[in-house]
Amino acid sequence: MEEKSIFIEYFGDSPYMKVLNFLIGGQEFDYSMTEIARGAEVGWSAFTRVWAHLLEKDIIKQTRTIGNAKLFKLNKNNPFVKRLIKFDLELTKLETSKLNQKEISA
């Protein structure tokens, strides 16, 4: 069984959360839509519904075009995205701290 990220454990594995989780994890890189859908393990029809919302809310931005492929990444200038990244980091710290406490107690 594949281990879920802390983000997915807290917020569920809906297509929207899976795409956000993938983009947060790879926030320094840009990806094609196909790469994001595959990396997030989301079917294409569900992905396109999520994608429309991410574009509408300015959560993602196009970075460049290679051939016919448009590449995208998280829009880290968006205040919501900034908070989301910070929140993901805080969740990771919290869960790591809990895990360390369990190991010390054992």
Predicted regions and their residues:
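Glycine-centered, phosphate/nucleic-acid-interacting loop/turn motifs that mediate DNA/RNA or nucleotide
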Residues: 58
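Amphipathic alpha-helical dimerization/coiled-coil segments
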Residues: 79-106
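Short helix-capping/hinge SLiMs at alpha-helix to coil transitions
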Residues: 24-29
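Short, cationic-aromatic polyanion-contact patches
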Residues: 7-16, 32, 62-87
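Short, hydrophobic-biased segments on the C-terminal half of alpha helices
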Residues: 51-52
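A short acidic, leucine-rich amphipathic alpha-helix
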Residues: 35-39
